């Protein structure tokens, strides 16, 4: 945590919302949200649809004409505030909404890049973001735009003016809570989680009335905690002490820091849950449910419908928060309502999304050694020789046995979202090849202090690359193609009906690949690392591509030896928009 304090002191400017008036904007409806994966003029959800497949049906741009894709404009986030820019933008009626580091939100003319308005949150001293001062995006609904802030607040703004409509506390930032994800809109409710898993917080998913900001329900994800519905206690999550000893469940982690997906047909929202607290697993024997899990939740009342734990009794910070992407899979001549997730533990899971039944788990990174495999029920077959030792059993009682474990704690895949193409039936997974030395240390919970109980050094697995973009067939469980990158990959992925896959690199490139073969067909240098998720939309009869740029995130803060591969990369803060001119579209 000491690594980050030097830039937190810059926080504390007064909230500011200034800019130009916007023309009339049609309200974003429930139907707009549900149809976002099919429509082309707008992008109104994080993930290009509630299922977050990040697939666009636009096929104007293809490998034959992509050489004509050129920059249209670049918008600077301004000021001295830089750090990581991990936001996915939204577009509605010619206005682009993009969040920036330090809890900022901008409305920009999508044709010209002219700023319409901006909102700068009032961030107090002492905020505790674990992994840089990032924000991953906003949500649109009716006439408002919503986003969360690093001091654990949820803000609703007027889309036209950027003026605050309401501002609500998610939780107490002094206890370690924060918020970095893009909210999700489901049936008139705004769905959020919490960040702060390294500080002994308790993860939860909650729903608020999108008009008023008032809480409708809360669902803690750690066993023993009581849910809430309409202001009253509802049901307990699991059973107290069933998989947590003593009072460890009170500070059990499981932060829901990445946001969720939604299946409207099944009426289920899917959330991943983070690492248990503390990292030192010797202090909490048991499965520690529902940390490091995927949960299906009823959006009407917050009840858990099913849960699947990818790393029970996690001892490596393998988290479990990565997105669960619904898709339909052909198996034995039948269509299976499936969902997939590329877990930080290095396995690519496919589950039945109706009931959480385990279908398959396949390694997607090299040299996994914390587990010997996954059994027929989806449970890891642990290699206990590669679990960090209990410091209480060491000679000095201060440091347990150190082990080398693969993947490293930043994961086979971290936050950066995968994409799925129904055309190729492939998932595109931004992964990293690294391991770590890790050991356990004594720790006690203290409000607002890091609750790790572990030390670590992360190291690259190979000399020639760390980053690896892989195309994975969920039916055959095979890697179809792979692109290797020298530095870690930290950007999200976009795929299109034009047989293209887009992602960014820390070296400053936005790149495009042939979706079937993995051949690199285009790249553009934006001058700083790309760690955001690209989008695409149609405007004036042309296809546009957009991405935020600005190096940062967890790698330079936590990356140890692998951070050396990015040591010379400049920070930045901007949004780049590219277009394929009509005259070049047919070439």
From Swiss-Prot:
SUPFAM superfamilies: Quinoprotein alcohol dehydrogenase-like (SSF50998). Transmembrane segments: none annotated. GO terms for cellular component: membrane; outer membrane-bounded periplasmic space. Disruption phenotype: Cells lacking this gene are not affected for growth with ethanol, with or without exogenous La(3+), indicating that either XoxF-type MDH (in the presence of La(3+) or MxaFI-type MDH (in the absence of La(3+))) can support growth with ethanol as well. The triple mutant lacking mxaF, xoxF1 and xoxF2 can grow with ethanol only when exogenous La(3+) is added to the growth medium, and additional loss of exaF eliminates this growth. Deletion of exaF alone does not impact growth with methanol, with or without lanthanide, demonstrating that ExaF is not a primary methanol oxidation system. Residues 1-26 form the signal peptide. Disulfide bonds join 130-131. Homodimer. Belongs to the bacterial PQQ dehydrogenase family. This is Lanthanide-dependent ethanol dehydrogenase. It comes from Methylorubrum extorquens (strain ATCC 14718 / DSM 1338 / JCM 2805 / NCIMB 9133 / AM1).
